[in-house]
Amino acid sequence: MAKGLFDCTGKVTLVTGGNGGIGLGFAMGCARMGGDIAIWARNAEKNAAAKAQLLEAGAGRVETYVVDVSTEQAIIDGYGQIQQDFGRLDCVFANSGASPRFNSVFDMPTEHWHEFQAVALHGAFYTLREGARLMKERAEAGERGGSLVACGSLSLFQGLP
């Protein structure tokens, strides 16, 4: 039964970085609307805690996966697991991010810059692209395609120190 504006019953939502922060908040919203949720994040313990919270909030089904979105193949494999476990995908919330460990670009090693971009930029791109491919296949088969949501940083609009 819908609890608010949306009814997510029977809908599968993938939330990257969904075991805490904004990602968990988004997943909780879907859970309260009765949706099924897949979480990709790197910390298995935090994934398990998030799963318990989401089920308590009313999610239909929750599966968590240890997926590092900085690698394209991990994302492709992760979608294969979601397809195997749920059989469909209705929404992708690309939320994984990495916090800069340095206050100044002058102090940031190039290696850290590449690690940061592998998650924040490349990971979001791979996640959205591969999710869109699955949704396109469904749309071509006559079903509704789905929704893609990219979560960005306020630093897009105002530089951070």
What are these regions, as identified by a protein language model?
Residues 106-126, 149:
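Catalytic Tyr-X3-Lys loop
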Residues 140-161:
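Catalytic loop of short-chain dehydrogenase/reductase
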Residues 119-141:
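Amphipathic alpha-helical dimer-interface segment in Rossmann-like NAD(P)H-dependent oxidoreductases
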Residues 19-21:
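Conserved glycine-rich cofactor-binding loop
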Residues 76, 99-114, 137-143:
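Conserved mid-core segment of classical short-chain dehydrogenase/reductases
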Residues 33-49:
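Conserved glycine-rich Rossmann-like NAD(P)H-binding loop of the short-chain dehydrogenase/reductase
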Residues 16, 89-97, 120, 150:
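Rossmann-fold scaffold of SDR-type NAD(P)-dependent oxidoreductases
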Residues 44, 66-78, 110:
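The beta1-alpha1 cofactor-binding region of Rossmann-like NAD(H)/NADP(H)-dependent oxidoreductases
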